[in-house]
């Protein structure tokens, strides 16, 4: 009977250890995926910032040209 108890405890212990290792690996994978998502979000944010900055410059230039031509009389 004692032999069966020891065997059962050993099986349960090994099962818990392997389960713990699997959960740890799963957590690490989730952390890596989250970090990749954060990096992609930062890249998208930087791209949008650059695009909006460029669009603002173009709009400013066009507005300046439009307003400049409005103030001058045609000859």
Swiss-Prot record:
Pfam families: FSAP_sig_propep
Record key words, sorted: Amphibian defense peptide, Antibiotic, Antimicrobial, Cleavage on pair of basic residues, Fungicide, Immunity, Innate immunity, Membrane, Secreted, Signal, Target cell membrane, Target membrane
Composition bias, Acidic residues: 30-41
Superkingdom of this protein's organism: Eukaryota
Signal peptide (from-to): 1-22
InterPro entries: Frog_antimicrobial_propeptide, FSAP
Keyword Isomerase among record annotations: no
Main location: secreted
Region (Disordered) location: 25-44
Tissue: Expressed by the skin glands.
Protein family membership: Belongs to the frog skin active peptide (FSAP) family. Dermaseptin subfamily.
Descriptive protein name: Dermaseptin-S11
Annotated organism of origin: Phyllomedusa sauvagei (Sauvage's leaf frog)
